[in-house]
């Protein structure tokens, strides 16, 4: 794959075969999360469908035959798909995470192999009257894509309710941006909860509970969709994880107990 900038209007089709894209900047978002900006032709836009993700690939040693091994991980950009010349990835860095450690070693000018897109939810304006979201940690990234698509479209009347769980107040990613969006858009409601609250914390305390879901999400119904994205423990508690073949899998957990059906829930 070439590291040269490709002069096209949309990178979408070219990404299918893969590109090496240069890291322009990196910033600390929290104690274990960093924001990376990757650049390409400034006249082009990424052009991904809403909530689609990209695959990133990095070398990871050699196999018994001396050939390079690779680690591959999906990430959802948090930047506007129509932004020209760049996209942003928010990466949580795990001590044993092979790909996240690779990202943590990047310096401006270094390149990352990117391929995709992988389409997730096929969002259409007004596809549901009310969308509820349950996110944990970096599980906020696909939610932000959907939220911004709804809010920037004056013809989209969808009501959005977000329950966002984190370990501590300092771990809440993109909180300032989310708060600004909620303050300026009455169709967006957000409830934060943390495991380890500070003395001045006024939001929820503990894991997302059945009571939080009842109070913060739209009721089950044909015009309701609940989106879920977070770490495995949260997924198990809320909805059950996806199947081994990455299909949606059986709906279990709190959402099933509250009467939601598989057609009302989408797991990222």
Language model features: what each stretch is:
Residues 7-110, 166-168, 195-196:
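Ferredoxin-reductase
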Residues 51, 139, 231:
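Short, conserved phosphate/pyrophosphate- and ester-handling motifs at nucleotide-, phospho-/glycolipid
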Residues 116-128:
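A short, basic/flexible loop-to-alpha-helix module at the beginning of a structural domain
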Residues 130-132, 161, 225:
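Structural motif
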Residues 138-143, 234:
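Hydrophobic/small residue at the entry helix of a nucleotide-binding pocket
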Residues 142-154:
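Histidine-anchored nucleotide/phosphate-binding helix
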Residues 163-268:
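Reductase modules of NAD(P)H-dependent flavoproteins
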């Amino acid at each position: 794959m070439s590291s040269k900038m490709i002069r096209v209007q949309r990178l979408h089709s070219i990404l299918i075969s893969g590109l090496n894209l240069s890291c322009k900047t990196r910033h600390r978002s929290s104690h274990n999360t960093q924001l990376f900006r990757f650049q390409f032709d400034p006249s082009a836009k990424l052009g991904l469908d809403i909530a689609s993700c990209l695959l990133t690939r990095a070398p990871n040693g050699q196999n018994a035959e001396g050939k390079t091994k690779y680690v591959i991980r999906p990430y959802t950009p948090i930047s506007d798909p129509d932004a020209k010349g760049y996209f942003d990835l928010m990466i949580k860095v795990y001590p044993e995470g092979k790909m996240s450690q690779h990202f943590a070693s990047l310096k401006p000018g270094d390149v990352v192999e990117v391929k995709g897109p992988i389409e997730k939810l096929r969002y259409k304006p007004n596809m549901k009257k009310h969308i509820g979201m349950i996110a944990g940690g970096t599980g906020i990234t696909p939610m932000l894509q959907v939220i911004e698509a709804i809010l920037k479209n004056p013809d989209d009347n969808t009501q959005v309710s977000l329950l966002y769980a984190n370990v501590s107040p300092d771990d809440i990613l993109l909180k300032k941006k989310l708060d600004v969006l909620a303050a300026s858009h009455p169709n967006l409601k957000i409830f934060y909860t943390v495991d380890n609250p500070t003395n001045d914390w006024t939001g929820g305390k503990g894991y997302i509970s059945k009571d939080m879901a009842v109070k913060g999400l739209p009721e089950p119904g044909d015009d309701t969709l609940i989106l879920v994205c977070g770490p495995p423990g949260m997924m198990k508690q809320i909805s059950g994880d996806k199947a081994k073949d990455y299909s949606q899998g059986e709906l279990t957990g709190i959402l099933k107990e509250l009467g939601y059906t598989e057609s009302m829930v989408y797991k990222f």
